[in-house]
Swiss-Prot record:
Intrachain disulfide bonds: none
Gene it is expressed from: rplW
Protein's UniProt name: Large ribosomal subunit protein uL23
Function in brief: One of the early assembly proteins it binds 23S rRNA. One of the proteins that surrounds the polypeptide exit tunnel on the outside of the ribosome. Forms the main docking site for trigger factor binding to the ribosome.
Lineage: Bacteria, Bacillati, Bacillota, Clostridia, Eubacteriales
Organism of derivation: Clostridium novyi (strain NT)
Coiled-coil region list: none
């Protein structure tokens, strides 16, 4: 089983994800092997908040070319986490 701190890779900082923060919804890139219950427990443990809902999406890495060499970016999983109304906000995103 993955450690809670290893499961959450990084936050997604885009215009769309920042607009969703007004609705108490935060977006993270997570380990591709993680399921929704593991993601919920990890976010609650790491940030000390209450999670209401977790939605996930899995993406295939793009094929990229540099000259004659062809490579592929890594596959990744994105998790959209919605917090409960009585939960505090995640301090990491404050001031962005």
């Amino acid at each position: 089983m993955l450690n809670s701190y290893d499961l959450i890779r990084r936050p997604v900082i885009t215009e769309k994800s920042m607009a969703a923060m007004a609705d108490r919804q935060y977006t993270f890139i997570v380990d591709i092997r993680a399921d929704k219950t593991q993601i919920k427990k990890a976010v609650e443990k790491v940030f000390g908040v209450k999670v209401e809902e977790v939605r996930t999406a899995r993406f295939d890495g793009k094929v990229k070319r540099v000259g004659v060499h062809v490579g592929k970016r890594s596959d990744y999983k994105k998790a959209m986490v919605k917090l409960t109304e009585d939960s505090k906000t995640i301090e990491f995103f404050e001031g962005m």
